[in-house]
Swiss-Prot record:
Similarity field: Belongs to the peptidase M20A family. DapE subfamily.
Subunit description: Homodimer.
Binding positions for Zn(2+) 2 per the UniProt entry: 104, 139, 353
Active site positions: 73, 138
Amino acids binding Zn(2+) 1: 71, 104, 167
Top-level lineage group: Bacteria
Function according to Swiss-Prot or TrEMBL: Catalyzes the hydrolysis of N-succinyl-L,L-diaminopimelic acid (SDAP), forming succinate and LL-2,6-diaminopimelate (DAP), an intermediate involved in the bacterial biosynthesis of lysine and meso-diaminopimelic acid, an essential component of bacterial cell walls.
Cited PROSITE patterns: ARGE_DAPE_CPG2_2 (PS00759)
GO BP term, example: L-arginine biosynthetic process
Name the UniProt record assigns to this protein: Succinyl-diaminopimelate desuccinylase
Pfam families noted in UniProt: M20_dimer, Peptidase_M20
Catalysed reaction equations from the record: N-succinyl-(2S,6S)-2,6-diaminopimelate + H2O = (2S,6S)-2,6-diaminopimelate + succinate
């Protein structure tokens, strides 16, 4: 066996991947991590909310608090016949570790833990505290996961100073991109009311599709803002639309539309809601609408966490990383509102949520070194 195949981070990543922890299952991943963190001097606190398993682990009692955040749950594997290897039987092929969760994000979890073990061994009297916030409900409804842990910490005034989320942020090579912010996400569920009837007698019915179409067109064409130097302009997308009985001779009685905003810091959810309602009202629609607040936008500007991350990636990989705010949401959106600086640093995201998910073994080694260097930059001054 090669040295890479025998490494601590690869061994742990394999152990984690072998556990089929599809949301909201944890399948013992956190217990495995907790055992090793306990040996490194961490106090372990399990927080179980309904069907979700969470772990808060902390070493030290002083500020500042550096927190690794991540999730043990993975998305479903999909069609097993399309996998080259069984998704929960991790295997290395040509320097790539294959398995569900390899990139998102059990590889990152392994790198976090091994980096922390090494750091604590070298610097047992480090400044501040190190913490882990791990959940089994990131890929799912995100109701009983990180948000509940944060509520618990806030209730007892336990604050995180810096948080590194291990989401796969890299695009082409490890460290080329980190996420120092994310757009907000707001979902609208709209029902436009009409009167069902026969298509041959439209004067006896009221077609909600015809009524809604101009309003939806205006919403789709609207320029919501211009973005700024950190965020692209706010985007509006219709995700689902449903109306009709399936018959060609029936005018539907209602039209259901689900749409989503990914919005910048130039607007708020309240502003977007007000503008949507004004457009719907201007078109004279009879409607019901409900809203789902998926997360606020956040941004970590220049400061200790971003500087430490840039320096670590440059030292380990030679790459000048590019901080970006593009992409979907992450659990960082629940941590940032507490006042913490938040950044996402992880492996290449080319295969996440796909069949044959994989990550370069050599990247896991580099990621471990990056995480350890970030700890040193922040807690060894």
């Amino acid at each position: 066996m090669s040295q890479l195949q025998e490494s601590a981070v690869l061994s742990l990543a394999k152990d984690l991947i072998s556990r089929p922890s599809v949301t909201p299952l944890d399948e013992g991943c956190q217990s495995l991590m907790a055992e090793r963190l306990s040996q490194a001097g961490f106090e372990i606190e399990s927080m179980v909310f309904d069907d979700t398993t969470n772990m808060w682990a902390r070493r030290g009692t002083q500020s500042p608090v550096f927190c690794f955040a991540g999730h043990t749950d993975v998305v479903p594997v999909g069609d097993l016949n399309r996998w080259h290897t069984p998704p929960f039987e991790p295997v290395v092929i040509d320097d790539y570790l294959h398995g569900r969760g390899a990139a998102d994000m059990k590889g990152s979890l392994a790198a976090m833990l091994v980096a922390t073990e090494r750091f604590v061994n070298k610097h047992p009297d480090h400044q501040g505290s190190i913490a882990f916030l791990i959940t089994s409900d990131e890929e799912g409804p995100f109701i009983n996961g990180t948000t509940r842990v944060i509520d618990t910490l806030e209730a007892r005034n336990e604050k995180i100073t810096w948080s590194l989320v291990g989401e796969p942020s890299s695009t082409h090579k490890l460290g080329d991109i980190v996420k120092n912010g994310r757009r907000g996400s707001l979902t609208g569920n709209l029902t436009v009311k009409g009167i069902q009837g026969h298509v041959a007698y439209p004067h006896l019915a009221d077609n909600p599709i015809h009524k809604a179409a101009p309003a939806l067109d205006e919403l789709a064409r609207m320029k919501w803002d211009n973005g700024n130097e950190f965020f692209p302009p706010t985007s509006f997308q219709i995700a689902n639309i449903n109306g009709g009985t399936g018959a060609s001779n029936v005018i539907p009685g209602a039209l259901e539309v689900m749409f989503n905003f990914r919005y910048s810091t130039e607007v708020t959810a309240e502003i977007l809601i007000e503008r949507v309602l004004n457009i719907l009202d201007a078109h004279g629609l009879d409607y019901d609408i409900s809203w789902v607040y998926n997360g606020l936008p956040f941004l970590t500007g220049e400061g200790p966490l971003l500087e430490a991350t840039k320096a670590a990636i440059k030292k380990v990989t030679g790459t000048d990383t590019d901080p970006q705010t593009s992409g979907g949401t992450s659990d960082g959106r629940f941590i940032a509102p507490t006042g913490a600086q938040v950044i996402e640093v992880g492996p290449v995201n080319a295969t996440i949520h796909k069949v044959n998910e994989c990550v370069k073994v050599s990247d896991l080694e580099l990621l471990t070194d990056c995480y350890e260097a970030i700890l040193e930059n922040l807690l060894c001054k």
